[in-house]
């Protein structure tokens, strides 16, 4: 009984220390930028590749909100001044609205892909 209680206590303490370390990493390094994974352009969906090409050539964009300033209120991208990031829609087959997929870019071209409406991001590697 004592050994089981001790094991549970060690497990709970380990979880606490891990969560504290992650929270500290996020707060000390500006918006959790160290936690962002990456994705190669070739690994993106065909729709994301088309959107990325339109971004690089400056349009024309299929959605009126494409190119608007992205506020990064979710604080999941590296911290920058307001106006640095702009968002663009990635068309989602079978969805009548804009859907959840986005590409967010800063200047110089530093782009991130989100397939879950800004919950997670992957930096796009050329």
Which sequence ranges carry the predicted segments?
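N-terminal secretory signal peptides that target proteins for export/translocation
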Residues: 1-4
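Bacterial N-terminal signal peptides
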Residues: 7-20
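Small/flexible residues
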Residues: 8, 28, 103-104
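Generic signature of intrinsically disordered, low-complexity, basic-rich segments
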Residues: 19-21, 47, 88
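N-terminal secretory signal peptides
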Residues: 24-72, 76
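Functional cores of ribonucleases/endoribonucleases
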Residues: 56-126
